[in-house]
């Protein structure tokens, strides 16, 4: 019974040696568990085998939700599913998180080291968090971490991913937040998995790499930070104040969590499979995070930092994104004056996808700030320039036929200022 014990989700770097050993033993046991509640079954929730829209359907697709306003809810349930499974296998704490918004030069040792010294057996054991096995294809997961993940900006500055998360946290409309939040999260999948076919950058097999759980515990923590910010701002935080409340998806069970116990044996996630029942994580799922600080900033300090950021005129590139049937890196450039002068890099982001995914199209733009890029080119809003993009697969090959529509240029005046 998980309903009466408060679980604390700790930063992976603050786990004690005993907690690390306990988590590893629990994951090792979970990976050996071939029942409906075992590792293979949970990992399949995100991709293969496909169970949606229902297991008996003639044409099925992966159940994972991307490009939709219920992305945070679906993945919050998935963290609870994993947390409960680890606790059933002996772990007594909460699902740890890897704070990838902070500067870093390597993956956490907890997930990167191939072996560890087990204090119980006094033996060197294989680290179950370094990879997982995909029974359906007979492969272990692998990683090809890209150098772009490792950034160490100076004091008072943020990594590229942290900047994208800050823009998400700035939004006080849930659906605006969700778009920025989800695209920022995509980077970790692509940067950790790289071009490896069985791992974090391949939608079918995301969840078979145990680092997924730490990544999504942090993704969920960032949603919790936004919720705390909303409460501080006097805005809705345990509901959605946007289009999600007008759609049936808000009131329908998220799958496969809402399916019967043959697919989902976890009573807790099945009983909370409707999105509106997922917001209040503290009461409904009985967990809290060790810290809701963002890069060392408390909620009040973070709010002040966001106000500081908004106190300047800013310019953004706007992309109305949709699924393209595969994962991709999108790079975009500023074109000065004429079409041939287009080699001025302005930014990049990742789209996640697969042929087996649910179709999606955002109903609002994803924004990427280009103020500094324009400043460096001595350009201003209203000058003669436009934006151009290129899409690449994760092997670096051009996806010339991908149509993401022409990016727009969005000017946002400093907060409190007025334009004619």
UniProtKB/Swiss-Prot annotation:
Keyword NAD attributed: no
Changes after translation: O-glycosylated.
Positions of disulphide bridges: 52-63, 175-242, 335-342
Keyword set includes Glycoprotein: yes
Binding, Cu cation A: 46, 66, 73
SUPFAM superfamilies xref list: C-terminal domain of mollusc hemocyanin, Di-copper centre-containing domain
Database matches in Pfam families: Haemocyan_bet_s, Tyrosinase
Chief site of localization: secreted
Any one GO molecular function term: oxygen carrier activity
Intracellular or extracellular location(s): Secreted, Extracellular space
A GO CC term assigned to this protein in UniProt: extracellular region
Region entry Disordered, spans: 1-20
Binding site for Cu cation B: 185, 189, 216
Biased composition regions of type Basic residues, renumbered to the chain: 1-12
Tissue specificity field: Hemolymph.
Family annotation (InterPro entries): Di-copper_centre_dom_sf, Haemocyanin_beta-sandwich, Haemocyanin_C_sf, Tyrosinase/Hemocyanin, Tyrosinase_Cu-bd
Keywords tagged on the record: Copper, Disulfide bond, Glycoprotein, Metal-binding, Oxygen transport, Secreted, Transport
Physiological role: Hemocyanins are copper-containing oxygen carriers occurring freely dissolved in the hemolymph of many mollusks and arthropods.
Name of the protein: Hemocyanin 2-c chain
Source organism of the structure: Megathura crenulata (Giant keyhole limpet)
Lineage of the species this protein comes from: Eukaryota, Metazoa, Spiralia, Lophotrochozoa, Mollusca
């Amino acid at each position: 019974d998980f309903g009466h014990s408060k679980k604390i989700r700790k930063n992976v770097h603050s786990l004690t040696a005993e907690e690390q050993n306990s988590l590893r033993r629990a994951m090792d046991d979970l990976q050996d568990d071939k029942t409906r509640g075992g590792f293979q079954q949970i990992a399949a929730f995100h991709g293969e085998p496909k169970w949606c829209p229902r297991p008996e359907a003639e044409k099925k697709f992966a159940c994972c939700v991307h490009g939709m306003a219920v992305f945070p809810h679906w993945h919050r349930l998935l963290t609870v599913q994993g947390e409960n499974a680890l606790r059933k296998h002996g772990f007594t704490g909460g699902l740890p998180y890897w704070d990838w918004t902070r500067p870093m030069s390597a993956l956490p040792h907890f997930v990167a080291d191939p072996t560890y010294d087990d204090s119980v057996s006094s033996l060197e054991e294989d680290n179950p968090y370094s990879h997982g096995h995909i029974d359906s294809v007979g492969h272990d997961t692998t990683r090809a971490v890209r150098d772009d993940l490792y950034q160490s900006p100076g004091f008072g500055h943020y990594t590229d991913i942290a900047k994208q998360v800050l823009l998400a946290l700035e939004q006080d409309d849930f659906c605006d937040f969700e778009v920025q939040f989800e695209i920022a999260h995509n980077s970790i999948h692509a940067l950790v998995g790289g071009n490896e076919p069985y791992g974090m950058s391949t939608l079918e097999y995301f969840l078979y790499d145990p680092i997924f759980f730490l990544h999504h515990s942090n993704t969920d923590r960032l949603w919790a930070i936004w919720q705390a910010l909303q409460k501080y701002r006097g805005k809705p935080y345990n509901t959605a104040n946007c289009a999600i409340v007008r759609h049936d998806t808000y009131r329908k069970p998220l799958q496969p969590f809402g399916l019967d116990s043959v697919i989902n044996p976890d009573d807790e996630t099945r009983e909370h499979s409707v999105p509106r029942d997922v917001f209040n994580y503290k009461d409904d799922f009985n967990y809290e995070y060790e810290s809701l600080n963002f890069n060392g900033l408390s909620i009040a300090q973070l709010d002040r930092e966001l106000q500081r950021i908004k106190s300047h005129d800013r310019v953004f590139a706007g992309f109305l994104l949709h699924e393209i049937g595969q994962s991709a890196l999108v790079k975009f450039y500023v074109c000065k004056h004429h079409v041939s002068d287009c080699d001025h890099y302005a930014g990049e982001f990742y789209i996640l996808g697969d042929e087996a995914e649910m179709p999606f199209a955002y109903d609002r733009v994803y924004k990427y700030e280009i103020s500094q890029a324009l400043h460096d080119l001595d350009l201003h809003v209203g000058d003669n320039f436009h934006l151009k993009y290129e899409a690449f697969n994760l092997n670096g090959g051009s996806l010339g036929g991908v149509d993401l529509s022409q990016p727009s240029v969005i000017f946002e005046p400093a907060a409190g200022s007025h334009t004619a």
